Amino acid sequence: MTIMRKSHPLMKIVNHAFIDLPTPPNISGWWNFGSLLGLCLVLQILTGLFLAMHYTSDTTTAFSSVTHICRDVNYGWLIRYMHANGASLFFICLYIHIGRGIYYGSYLYTETWNIGILLLFLTMATAFVGYVLPWGQMSFWGATVITNLLSAIPFIGQDLVEWIWGGFSVDKSTLTRFFAFHFILPFIITALAMVHLLFLHETGSNNPLGIPSDCGKVPFHPYYTTKDLLGAILLLMLFMTLVLFFPDKLGDPDNYTPANPLNTPPHIKPEWYFLFAYAILRSIPNKLGGVCALVFSILVLALLPYLHTSKQRSLSFRPLSQTMFWALVSDLIILTWIGGQPVEPPYIIIGQVASILYFSIILILMPMAGLIENKMLKW
């Protein structure tokens, strides 16, 4: 008689994905972030569902409905802050997950990598439309500025913007449709995450050495279930510390002022996790050029499998490429800082240099470092 988990049609799928999955024996803590992203997604869907029960997507009542959630709903303040800070946590895990993929050459699993990029785009879209919903000052003006960027598209730009707005400005219809998008997108993300896993399990996981580990794989359970559980506990401790002690640390004070189309905030800026892209957008004086740079700053990740020049997969034994990688991380931190600063000297030139450096490292310097290291292997 076979074990039920191996014979039952539903249990069999779970078994192949999370129990008997052959896993490399040497994957480090950096491989925990995939499961942590799953945890973040579940957390966001659950808290979002409870918020949607009390939220109203109408310009006259949206702001007061969020206030009502925080003041009158049982533990509404907790659900609201868990959802708001959960987005930040999601992006922290997401950026570390992408960074690990770049460092250890996981992008060579092209299908998994490309679906990951699509997931990143969808997550960014979800976060953007979600940020508009509380209908505070920064929500309204953020929506106005970012949707207006589409008007840079030749011929159809202006029509496209008005079609998305549902009128001639960001108004009631915009808020209603953004709420609809914000509700449906996480479920599309969940479905795509399953496809992401499906493609990953076709090839098996990469490992820190970047070499095949078929000869020494171990079952996922109990080794990596316990390891993922430890990661989840540590992450939740960090998360609840943020939610309970510093709930507004990552938010914008302007969002505690109701949206007013007649009063523009002095500095319009997105949440911290979009600041690097916002800095790249602002560093180009031309509107269409800025929009193209903004999109390409994420799309450039899709070129990584084709820019891989090294004979080795991982950066573990490639000091020159490691230097380039950490220069890229430092550059992204600088871009994030610049994105939050006003458009004035010296921030303008710093942003422009950092933007050029960002594309140079990915498109030129890292492939060159790979070629130099190939030469060094022959010495």
Curated annotation (Swiss-Prot):
A ubiquinone binds at H201. Binds 2 heme b groups non-covalently. It is a multi-pass membrane protein. Keywords: Electron transport, Heme, Iron, Membrane, Metal-binding, Mitochondrion, Mitochondrion inner membrane, Respiratory chain, Transmembrane, Transmembrane helix, Transport, Ubiquinone. SUPFAM superfamilies: a domain/subunit of cytochrome bc1 complex (Ubiquinol-cytochrome c reductase), Transmembrane di-heme cytochromes. InterPro entries: Cyt_b/b6_C, Cyt_b/b6_C_sf, Cyt_b/b6_N, Cytb/b6-like_sf, Cytochrome_b, Cytochrome_b_C_euk/bac, Cytochrome_b_N_euk/bac, Di-haem_cyt_TM. GO terms for molecular function: metal ion binding; ubiquinol-cytochrome-c reductase activity. Gene3D superfamilies: Cytochrome Bc1 Complex, Chain C. This is Cytochrome b. Component of the ubiquinol-cytochrome c reductase complex (complex III or cytochrome b-c1 complex) that is part of the mitochondrial respiratory chain. The b-c1 complex mediates electron transfer from ubiquinol to cytochrome c. Contributes to the generation of a proton gradient across the mitochondrial membrane that is then used for ATP synthesis. The chain crosses the membrane at residues 33-53, 77-98, 113-133, 178-198, 226-246, 288-308, 320-340, 347-367. It is found in: Mitochondrion inner membrane. Belongs to the cytochrome b family. One of its GO terms (biological process) is mitochondrial electron transport, ubiquinol to cytochrome c. Its main location: mitochondrion. Heme b b562 binds at H83, H182. The keyword Membrane applies. Heme b b566 binds at H97, H196.
